C-alpha cells in the first residue's frame, strides 16, 4: 500500500518517534496526541481493520500494546490509560490501516471519552443477543 502513511512509516520512508519495533509491529508517538505519551501500535503489514488481521498477528499486536502500556506507565504515566481502536469510517477511523491508540490518562487532563447511554427494552436485548450468538 504505497500511499498508506502507516505503511510508509513501517518501511522507514517517513520518520516517526518510534518507541518500539519488531519484525511485525511498530509503535510510535501520535503526531496529534490526545495526551502526553499518546502512542499508536501498528502492524507492519497492511490490514484495514481488526477483522482483517490474522490471529497470530493480532496476538503480537496485543502483546506489543501491553509492552508499550507498561513502558508508558513506568516512564511518564500512573498506570491509567485508554485503549482505542477505531474500525471503519463511522467509528472515526481516519487512516485505513488497523492501529491501536494508547492514551495515558492523568488526574487533571480533562480528556473525556463519553457517549450518550441508550437503553434496551427486554425484547430488544434478547433479539440483539440472539442475532450476535448466531455468528459467534
Regions found by a protein language model. Name each.
Residues 1-136:
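HIT superfamily nucleotide-processing domains
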Amino acid at each position: 500500500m504505497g500511499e498508506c502513511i502507516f505503511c510508509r512509516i513501517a518501511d522507514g520512508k517517513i520518520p516517526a518517534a518510534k518507541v518500539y519495533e519488531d519484525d511485525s509491529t511498530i509503535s510510535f508517538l501520535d503526531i496529534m496526541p490526545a495526551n502526553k505519551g499518546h502512542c499508536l501500535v501498528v502492524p507492519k503489514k497492511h490490514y484495514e481493520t481488526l477483522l482483517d488481521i490474522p490471529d497470530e498477528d493480532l496476538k503480537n499486536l496485543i502483546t506489543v500494546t501491553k509492552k508499550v502500556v507498561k513502558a508508558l506507565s513506568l516512564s511518564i504515566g500512573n498506570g491509567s490509560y485508554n485503549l482505542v481502536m477505531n474500525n471503519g469510517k463511522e467509528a472515526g477511523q481516519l487512516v485505513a490501516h488497523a492501529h491501536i491508540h494508547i492514551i495515558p490518562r492523568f488526574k487533571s487532563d480533562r480528556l473525556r471519552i463519553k457517549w450518550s447511554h441508550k437503553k434496551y427494552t427486554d425484547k430488544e436485548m434478547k433479539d440483539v443477543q440472539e442475532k450476535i450468538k448466531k455468528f459467534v
